[in-house]
Amino acid sequence: MKKALIAMSGGVDSSVAAKLMLDAGYDCMGATMKLFDSDDILMAQREKTCCSLSDVEDARSVARRLGMPYQVFNFKGDFKEKVIDKFIATYEAGGTPNPCIDCNKCLKFDTLCRRAITLGYDYVVTGHYARIDCVDGRYRLRKALDDKKDQSYVLYNLSQEQLAHTLFPLGELHKDQVRAIAEENGFINAHKRESQDICFVPDGDYAAFIESYTGRHYPPGDFVDTQGHVLGRHKGIIRYTIGQRRGLGLALPAPLYVCKKDPESNTVTLCPNDQLNSTVVRVTEFNWLSIAAPAEPLHAAVKIRYNMHQAPCTVEVLPGGDVQLTFDTPQRAVTPGQAAVIYDGDTVLGGGRIV
């Protein structure tokens, strides 16, 4: 009998994933990753995080109801080093990170997967909405059947070895079906609200989290236009992201948007909306997942942020391994630090970090 370790967040998706794996005949154990102490999170946010006591108890309740063992694993050190510290460093360098991608690669499908294998489990199972198949000996990551819930974008950075030890039982289901299964089985979290924010910054105030967590102060500096003329003062470079208009605190004759952040000069550059468009973007740390790196340029589709439609582009591998994307139609507010993930239909070809 194959054995599966279920990564349980306390939410409905991972709970139903556990139920489906048991129904499929797997020997299962539930596990929740403890990623940070609540003392590390602002007081007002503690009970909103995925590592709150209530979430652990929800996961434990479902595991008990399903009659499977359950453990909590302490991965705080790895999470701090590989996710939180990188999140902060990216903001300080002027980028806008996506820590969920790093958590998936480094924690769920690395640290947790290695723990699972050590304990004798064959697979790690999560409640992600995505699919995996294998063609000619190569694993492919594919979009979920439910396009509105698809999470393949945040999974592009997995390796072939990680895909080989991963199962996504929700990939063929829609969210309403998942909630119905939870309700039929009396799960305590059947109607639990989904988290839409970064787990360790659930209120979305990234700057406040960074200042509280590091104890550092990020000084004010100048807003400038594209010619370098000073337009006013900003409140610290970590408080802004590319494409932002609201919250600038400036009285301007026409709308301006953040188009560049320069940590060295501590300036934030503003421009009109029509100057936010990009035709070409460079992507680094590229992970070719479902195919090997192509020798010739190829035409594909790309997502440059989580909640966007795919945009057609030409993909070219550069000397050294970086990738250049040339959009068929200019794209607005391409943001350094975010992921660019390329698709062929519903298959994830690969992705990397925008520079």
Task: Report residues per predicted region.
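AMP-forming adenylation/ATP pyrophosphatase catalytic core
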Residues: V125-I132, G137-V355
